[in-house]
Design a protein with these regions (language model features):
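Phosphate-binding beta-alpha-beta segment of Rossmann-like dinucleotide-binding domains, i.e.
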Residues: 79-137
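Rossmann-like adenosine-cofactor binding region
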Residues: 39-44, 162, 166-259, 274
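Conserved small/polar residues in nucleotide/adenosyl-binding loops
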Residues: 301-306
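Adenosine-phosphate binding glycine-rich loop
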Residues: 260-299
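An N-terminal-biased, well-structured beta-alpha scaffold segment characteristic
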Residues: 1-78, 211-213, 234
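Oxidoreductase and adenylate-handling cofactor-binding alpha/beta cores
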Residues: 87-106, 155-159, 284-298
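Glycine-rich Rossmann-fold phosphate-binding loop(s) that bind the pyrophosphate
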Residues: 143-144
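N-terminal Rossmann-fold NAD(P) dinucleotide-binding loop
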Residues: 147-148
Length: 306
């Protein structure tokens, strides 16, 4: 009998994939496996019984990989399980940045006492006019599960799409639309694209990859979208550039004091995978990974301290 412990609420449709050989434990102590979403595990005392940690999500920044490796604990994640949910939010982010939809909605709310609001709206709507994304250039940095979906969807929306990923997998390459133009130098995306969306993991080599130097290469009307990891962008440099009118908008799914309320910043409260479908898919995949490891020794989608 295996014991598993959930550090966060895990979708029941996922837990239903455990059979009678698995029992949920109310305590971490004595657990053979742990399921986690966003709970911070750094500094947590890991029991000697623990064999596996499965993150119901793609990133593993909240898991102490070095400590797990030292104790022989295998860490799994669920890449691609929430990809469609994130893709849809990225597309929404592009539209929110292109047309002042949010500003228009707030104006309507503020004028709710106007008995002739329809006529007033006709006079005021010019204040919320924007641009269309069709025909614009989109640069996708990172062509993993999410990046490929974003690139393909943008093609169908009439955009001219450029993709950069020196480490693209065979699977991703097969799934990528032939209409996406391959870029070998990321600086070409910074210089040429109207929209730039980042979909790379957070590593020492990618931390603050979108820095002041990169921002200085961008067009004055550039819109940067970050639904991957907050530390991929030097947000202080980004806010300075927005204030100076050097680029148009920054859309992020990671609220913090630097960006919230700053000119040109559109910030959502980490909604990327916050859909019922994404949570279900991640939970199902995480449970199946644990079972496959416990029962068969399979090590698909593991993460390590490197």
């Amino acid at each position: 009998m295996f014991q598993y412990h959930c550090l966060n609420p895990i979708a029941g449709v996922g837990l239903a994939n455990f059979n009678e050989n698995y029992q949920q434990s109310e305590s971490l102590e004595g657990a053979d496996a742990v399921l986690v979403r966003s709970a911070a595990m750094h500094g947590m005392e890991l029991p000697k019984s623990l064999l596996a940690v499965a993150r119901a999500g793609a990133g593993v920044n909240n898991i102490p990989l070095a400590d797990c490796a030292e104790q022989g604990i295998v860490v799994f994640n669920t890449p691609g399980a929430n990809a469609n949910g994130v893709k849809e939010l990225v597309l929404a982010g592009m539209l929110l940045a292109s047309r002042d939809i949010a500003g228009g909605i707030e104006w309507v709310k503020s004028d709710k006492e106007d008995g002739d609001i329809a006529k007033t709206a006709e006079k005021q709507k010019k204040n919320f006019a924007g641009t269309e994304i069709s025909g614009k250039k989109l640069g996708v940095i990172g062509l993993g599960a999410i990046g490929v979906l974003v690139a393909n969807a943008a093609i169908h929306m009439g955009m001219d799409v450029y993709g950069y990923d020196p480490y693209i997998s065979v699977s991703a390459a097969w799934n990528l639309s032939r209409s996406v133009k391959h870029i070998s130098n990321v600086e070409d995306i910074y210089r040429e694209c109207d929209y730039i969306t980042i979909h790379v993991p957070l590593l020492d080599s990618t931390k603050k990859m979108v820095n002041a130097e990169a921002i200085a290469m961008m067009k004055p009307n550039a819109i940067v979208l970050n639904f991957a990891r907050d530390l991929l962008v030097d947000e202080e440099a980004m806010v300075e550039a927005l204030a100076a009118g050097k680029i148009k908008k920054y859309v992020s799914d990671f609220p913090n004091p630097t960006t919230v309320g700053a000119k040109g910043c559109i910030v959502t409260p980490h909604l990327g995978a916050s859909t019922a479908e994404s949570e279900d898919n991640c939970a199902i995949m995480a449970v199946r990974e644990i079972r496959d490891y416990m029962e068969n020794g399979c090590l698909l989608y593991t993460s390590d301290a490197a």
